[in-house]
């Protein structure tokens, strides 16, 4: 009983340490507690300080070269999968729990029957988990030679998760000895029962190994993908920035040249005003000179009345006036605009500067290992494009096939329209004597085999008149050199000879039906169906329509 309480205390200590350090496994906590004589405070301090790693290495945990971050991630993954593993382990641990007392008694076959009291049974159950723990703690040095770290951690978790179940419920404590007492001696059963546990470890190791590799590889590629995504988003932002910068630069250019334009206009206005002032000043000077010249001219007119002294002064005045002629020339050249346009052009050309983008990026080609992937991706995309084009090409003939019935129905509709317009055109086809002169003979020849069926065919003169009307409408449109052979072949089964129509009736028909070209064309399609229907009494009307098409062709050729 004391041993059971001791085990319960150990379990409580494990839970106490785990509450402070949740990312550590039970096996690691037990190892550190054993190192510090099951002192919870020292164990927690060791986990916090990081000295627990050295302690675990001392417990033959060599080969564990991973940092704390990797331990935390793995422990979180193990905690996430703990419930699923417990469900898988419960059916396997259940049958193994009753065998634990038999193994601990030193008898592997379990042949001895335990008839002791319940207290002894509880003591055996209490001893069982501790001895199992000690055996598990001693197993890693032997097992890690051929098993990787993932499989070893899974085996340790399975053993530690299986131990508390043997202690919890009173039903398990009481059922275990009863089952062992009631079982017969069978030395092969314990081996068969313990073998599944050994075989499950490699399987679990094989299942975990790809996941671990993916998780080792995953964070790196995820970080790269995130960096690539950020860079792509920033490219879009820079594109917007370039557009905004260009727009602002265009506005600045327009503003600068608008200011220059305004300055030029202002300068032009000022120069024009100054030129006006110069013109006025020059004109005033010339006006004064003109007045002085006129005054001297009047004095010269009075020279006959002057004395010698006055004449001498007049000559001096005229000489002085004439000597200032050079100033007149300078005055005429002074009113001139001068500007150094070339210098101004040079200043305008160097005015303003635009910085071009620098392509400082490296022209790095993809690695040789990535080129095959890119080529296969390009080939796959090309195949998909070809398949899409082929599928669209396959759909087009079906559309064409679907359009053909529409064309046939359109021909039929035009034929019906022509039949409906025939009675109205009968009044415009000339005198009825011409129709009687030609149609009765033709009617008697074609309807000869139809008379044996009684008066049924005589009751539809409208249909026959329609066929005669079609015969009159056909000569101009239906005549083509290609139809000569077909028309003669269609006349052969009838065994009849087409009579020559009177010339005046033919001319009348040509005048009457010159405007019906488009309505008569749809009936050419009936020629191919006539040869099959000539001998059918029930379809004599169709055959007459078809044979009527051939008669004018022979008539026109003759």
Curated annotation (Swiss-Prot):
Biased composition, class Basic residues, residue ranges: 63-79, 469-485
This protein's record includes keyword Coiled coil: yes
Domain of life (superkingdom): Eukaryota
Extent of the signal sequence: none
Modified residue annotations for Phosphoserine: 120
Name of one Pfam family that matches: SPATS2-like
Predominant location category: cytoplasm
InterPro entries according to UniProt: SPATS2-like, UBA-like_sf
Coiled-coil zones: 279-344
Compartments it resides in: Cytoplasm; Nucleus, Nucleolus
Region (Disordered): 63-204, 385-406, 421-514
Polar residues composition bias: residue spans: 421-433
Post-translational modification N-acetylalanine, affected residues: 2
Keywords, ordered alphabetically: Acetylation, Coiled coil, Cytoplasm, Nucleus, Phosphoprotein
This protein's GO CC annotations: cytosol; nucleolus; nucleoplasm; protein-containing complex
Keyword Translocase: no
Biased composition (Basic and acidic residues): 80-92, 110-142
Alphabetical list of PANTHER family matching this protein: SPATS2-LIKE PROTEIN (PTHR15623:SF8), SPERMATOGENESIS-ASSOCIATED SERINE-RICH PROTEIN 2-RELATED (PTHR15623)
Family of the protein in this entry: Belongs to the SPATS2 family.
Protein's name in the database: SPATS2-like protein
